[in-house]
């Protein structure tokens, strides 16, 4: 019984911070892949003023886009140089025709998603989903609220509508080198992905064996928590499939429990 409003990508682009500044908590969709600079800056400003973000997905804040200044609903994306993509911009077409700015991955624009979210795109696969195991960080005092009612050795999300697990389709991981805050807690990570799950191409300089889920430690989803300025915070699940596990057993499960734990705590203005 928590009141909510739905804000679209266009709302965030055209209204900026004003679209979300009055909310104590913003909850993302499961696959917020495309963001303009206006959208990115709005979320960054929201966090800096003490807003709290629950990122319930993966492959988010990935491609930089541009909206047409006169035609509503029209966006431009340039799939430059790198990243998982189904088509590629031709040489000389890396800049937006709408604005003249460079397109492509936000990571190549100096803004890896880890800087904003704690996690960023790392792997994808489309056979079955998996589950999470708790990490040592999960037992630290500041983040114990996340696991209220969840056992020390419970498998988190070994069920669900999307591949029978909460960690699946596309996965995000923490990486300090890419901007995950040094004080971020990596409280849980997914395990036992198949070799259908492969590391994304921007992580590789040359093609090599061992990029599948059975061998490569980059094939995982991380659940992270970090604080931002003025009492703000970010909690990220690292998986598109997370939402598919919420309704399992009439919402009586540890994925739903954890999500509710975080939402209730984020609504509470008390400092962490």
Name what the model sees in each region:
Residues 62-78, 126, 131-272:
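Extracellular ligand-binding/catalytic regions of CAZymes and related secreted enzymes
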Residues 81-156:
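Mid-to-C-terminal "cap/lid" subdomains and adjacent gly/pro-rich loops that border
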Residues 45-105:
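Catalytic or ion-translocation cores adjacent to nucleophile or general acid/base/metal-coordination motifs
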């Amino acid at each position: 019984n928590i009141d909510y409003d739905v804000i679209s990508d266009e709302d965030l682009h055209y209204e900026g911070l004003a679209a979300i500044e009055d909310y104590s908590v913003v909850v993302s969709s499961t696959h917020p892949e495309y963001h303009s600079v206006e959208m990115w800056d709005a979320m960054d400003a929201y966090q800096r003023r003490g807003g709290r973000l629950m990122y319930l997905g993966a492959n988010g804040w990935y491609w930089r886009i541009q909206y047409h200044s006169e035609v509503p609903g029209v966006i431009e994306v340039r799939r430059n140089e790198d990243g998982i993509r189904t088509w590629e911009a031709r040489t000389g077409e890396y800049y937006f025709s709408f604005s003249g700015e460079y397109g492509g991955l936000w990571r190549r624009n100096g803004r890896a998603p880890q800087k904003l979210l704690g996690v960023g795109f790392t792997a994808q696969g489309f056979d079955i989903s998996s589950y999470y195991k708790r990490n040592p960080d999960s037992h630290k005092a500041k983040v114990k609220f996340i696991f209220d009612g969840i056992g020390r050795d419970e498998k988190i999300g070994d069920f669900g509508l999307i591949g029978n697990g909460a960690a699946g389709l596309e996965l995000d991981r923490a990486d300090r080198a890419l901007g995950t805050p040094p004080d971020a807690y990596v409280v849980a990570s997914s395990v036992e992905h198949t070799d259908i799950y492969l590391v994304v191409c921007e992580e590789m300089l040359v093609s090599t064996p061992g990029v599948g889920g059975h061998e490569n430690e980059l094939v995982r989803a991380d659940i992270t928590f970090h604080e931002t300025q003025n009492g703000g915070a970010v909690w990220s699940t690292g998986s598109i499939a997370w939402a598919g596990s919420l309704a399992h057993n009439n919402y009586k499960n540890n994925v739903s429990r954890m999500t509710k734990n975080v939402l209730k705590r984020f609504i509470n203005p008390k400092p962490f």
